[in-house]
Amino acid sequence: MSKRITRVLFKISGESLSTDSGNRIDEVRLSRLVAELRAVRNCDIETALVIGGGNILRGLAQQKELQINRVSADQMGMLATLINGMAVADALKADDIPCLLTSTLSCPQLADLYTPQKSEEALNQGKIVICTTGTGSPYLTTDTGAALRACELKVDILLKATMHVDGVYNKDPRSFSDAVKYDRISFKDFLAQGLGVMDASAVSLCMDSNIPIRVFSFVKHSLEQAIFDENIGTLIGEEATHVHSS
C-alpha cells in the first residue's frame, strides 16, 4: 500500500482479552491492548475499534448448547461485546486516553448510541472510538459489523487481529501442514475460494468501498506493526494474489 494511512479500524477478537486459565478479561492482556492503542494514537492515526465477545459468550454455540433461539443467542453475543467494550473504555480512560464507547443497541446508561456522525466527530477530536454490539441485528457477525463501520467511517484500512493464524491461507494451517499462505489476495479470489478467516459479507462490503483488509497475528505482532509493516499477515484488496515464498 502506497497511500498514507491516517485512519484505521481494528477488529479485535474477544479472545485477545482472555487467558487459557479461564480469565474472561485478563488484566495483563487488557493493559497490553491499551498500551498498543496508545502507541497507534501517538502516531497521529485516528483509530476505531470493534471488539468481539467470544471470551464471554459465542452466540451460535450457546444456541446449540442451551437450546435457545438464534435471535436471542445473537443478541446475547452482542451484549458480550458491550461488556468487553466497557472494560476497554474504562482502561483507556484510566490511562488518560480519550475515547467514545458506542453501541448499536440503545442502552444510554452504558454507551452512546452509535451514529457515523458522532463517531466521525470523535475521531476528528483524537478520541478512540469503540464500536460494540456488531450491526445490532442477528445473523450477522462482528466481522460484518467491523466492515460496515469501516465503510461508514471511511477508514484507510481494516486490520483484523487474530489469535490463531498469521494471515490468510488456502486452507486451515492448524489442520493441514501443506497449507499455503498468501502475502496478498484479491477480494475476488478470496470470495471465489470461500476462505474462512473472514466473513464473505464483510469482505464484499470492503470490496464495494475499496477498503483493504490486513489479517495478522495479534500473538506475533503489534497493532502499530500491522499498520506500517507491509510484510506481516495477508493483505486482502484489489491487488493481484501473491503466494508467500518461504
Swiss-Prot record:
Similarity section: Belongs to the UMP kinase family.
Main location: cytoplasm
Activity control summary: Inhibited by UTP.
Gene that encodes the chain: pyrH
MF GO annotations: ATP binding; UMP kinase activity
Annotated binding of UMP, by residue: 53, 74, 135-142
CDD domains: AAK_UMPK-PyrH-Ec
Protein name per Swiss-Prot or TrEMBL: Uridylate kinase
